[in-house]
């Protein structure tokens, strides 16, 4: 991570940390870096989610892009993976998404995609940061005829919707409940699943700029669970604010997280001989039960640090086509370059249709170990140094010794927020609570803030 770029672009409180001035510079400098090797006039696609600050930041970002001669295609409200798909499929120079994903409405973020549809690597981000920190802006300032054009491009959303529909199966007769988190999926999920023929019940589809992720979506699936139970839906599908995540709900109202979704899709692909190298890429946060289920099926796994960018790096490096995170980021590389909640939803319903099994039956093949995760607010300057604090290091070692190999502990910094995450897994809830609470109390005493 750099000074400005975290694990998922530049994020901060809108108009306080992520200001219009910074957005303009990111557009200007980011656009310049990403278009240096273009033989034709560069084209950049820009999308946003439904946050009230989105249009403000979009206007500033677009101005920066236009100022270095880049043609900008405004996609409007669209899922982050929709931007990635369109950049690659339409051979654009780059893409930019304005979103803070699952964060609350007061936050926003800006993330870049290269012309290949993948998020930027560290080297490109550092190039942009160097320009941001330069004492003077020395980039070219073209006169009127050299400025970029601004194009509204609503067709992009329709093309993305049609593409996702083309990857699925007819769902005639299936009752699907959707929760679009009052976010980016509110412009697309209804149409996608209607085109597939599903009977729909939808919540979280009325964004007002302030209610994105508010008690809805993949981080708050309780409302969808209730809707599924009351409506008799066969499946519930909850997206986050920018629709790069999916959390599902089975017909009984029980949660099906990213680990189970990856297992279900991965086993399906493996049985068809379509799981590249018979391997799923996952992170250190995946549940022990997920690993045991893969072992039982003879499916290999590659484990990375937390963050979908690290999963994607591993997939690209070794030619894998399925990976993701427990949080619901699922990357299906045969179809898109990044985590795509709506794509994952289409593929999950496809497995249900092809196998004729209920989601609860498919998910029951993974027995999840009790897991507890506690987030502790700390200073940003301390979250990467926690393991250097003697008391924290000692209590973790003591808890691991007590586990005696039957469970695990993970303490890590958030990539996007001033938080230290303490996670444990063990055979019983009582043990998990004991391990996590013991460590969390020491962390709070040593480096926690109110």
From Swiss-Prot:
The keyword Magnesium is annotated on this UniProt entry: yes
Classification via InterPro entries: A-D-PHexomutase_a/b/a-I, A-D-PHexomutase_a/b/a-I/II/III, A-D-PHexomutase_a/b/a-II, A-D-PHexomutase_a/b/a-III, A-D-PHexomutase_C, A-D-PHexomutase_C_sf, A-D-PHexomutase_CS, Alpha-D-phosphohexomutase_SF
Signal peptide interval: none
GO cellular component: cytosol
Gene Ontology biological-process entries: carbohydrate metabolic process; peptidoglycan biosynthetic process; UDP-N-acetylglucosamine biosynthetic process
Record: active site: 101 (phosphoserine intermediate)
Cofactor(s) recorded in Swiss-Prot or TrEMBL: Mg(2+)
A GO term for molecular function: phosphomannomutase activity
Keyword Magnesium: yes
Cofactor, free-text remark: Binds 1 Mg(2+) ion per subunit.
PTM characteristics: Activated by phosphorylation.
Catalytic activity line of the entry: alpha-D-glucosamine 1-phosphate = D-glucosamine 6-phosphate
EC number: 5.4.2.10
Function per UniProt: Catalyzes the conversion of glucosamine-6-phosphate to glucosamine-1-phosphate.
Family per similarity comment: Belongs to the phosphohexose mutase family.
Name listed for the protein in its UniProt record: Phosphoglucosamine mutase
Naturally occurring in which organism (per UniProt): Streptococcus sanguinis (strain SK36)
Gene: glmM
């Amino acid at each position: 991570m750099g000074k400005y770029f975290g694990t998922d672009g530049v994020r901060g409180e809108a108009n306080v940390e992520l200001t219009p001035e910074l957005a303009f510079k990111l557009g200007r400098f980011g656009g310049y870096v990403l278009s240096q090797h273009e033989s034709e006039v560069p084209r950049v696609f820009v999308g946003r989610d439904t946050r009230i600050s989105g249009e403000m930041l979009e206007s500033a970002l677009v101005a920066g892009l236009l100022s270095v001669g880049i043609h900008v295609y405004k996609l409007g409200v669209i899922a982050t993976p929709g931007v990635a798909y369109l950049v690659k499929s339409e051979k654009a120079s780059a893409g930019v998404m304005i979103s803070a994903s699952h964060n609350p409405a007061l936050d926003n973020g800006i993330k870049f995609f290269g012309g290949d549809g993948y998020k930027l690597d560290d080297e490109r981000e550092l190039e942009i940061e160097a320009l941001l920190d330069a004492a003077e802006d020395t980039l070219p300032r073209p006169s009127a005829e050299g400025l970029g054009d601004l194009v509204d491009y609503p067709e992009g959303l329709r093309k993305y919707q049609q593409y996702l529909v083309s990857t699925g199966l007819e769902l005639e007769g299936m009752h699907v409940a959707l929760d679009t988190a009052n976010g980016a999926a509110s412009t697309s999920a209804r149409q996608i699943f209607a085109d597939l023929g599903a009977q729909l019940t939808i919540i979280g589809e009325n964004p007002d700029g302030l209610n994105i992720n508010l008690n809805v979506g993949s981080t708050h699936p309780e409302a969808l669970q209730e809707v599924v139970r009351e409506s008799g839906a066969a499946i519930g599908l909850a997206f986050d604010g920018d629709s790069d995540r999916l959390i599902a709900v089975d017909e009984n109202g029980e949660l099906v997280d990213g680990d189970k979704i990856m297992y279900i899709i991965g086993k399906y692909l493996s049985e068809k001989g379509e799981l590249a190298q018979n391997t799923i890429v996952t992170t250190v946060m995946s549940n022990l039960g997920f690993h045991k289920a893969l072992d039982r099926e003879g499916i290999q796994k590659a484990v990375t640090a937390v963050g979908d960018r690290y999963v994607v790096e591993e997939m690209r490096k070794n030619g894998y086509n399925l990976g993701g995170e427990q949080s619901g980021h699922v990357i299906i590389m045969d179809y898109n370059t990044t985590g795509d909640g709506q794509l994952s939803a289409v593929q999950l319903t496809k497995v249900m249709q092809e196998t004729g099994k209920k989601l609860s039956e498919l998910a029951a093949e993974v027995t999840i170990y009790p897991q507890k995760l506690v987030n502790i607010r700390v200073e940003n300057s301390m979250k990467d140094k926690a393991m250097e604090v003697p008391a924290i290091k000692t209590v973790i070692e003591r808890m691991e010794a007590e586990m005696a190999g039957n469970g695990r502990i993970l303490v890590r910094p958030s990539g996007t927020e001033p938080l230290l995450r303490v996670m444990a897994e063990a055979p019983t809830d009582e043990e998990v609570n004991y391990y996590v609470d013991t460590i969390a109390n020491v962390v709070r005493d040593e480096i926690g803030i109110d």
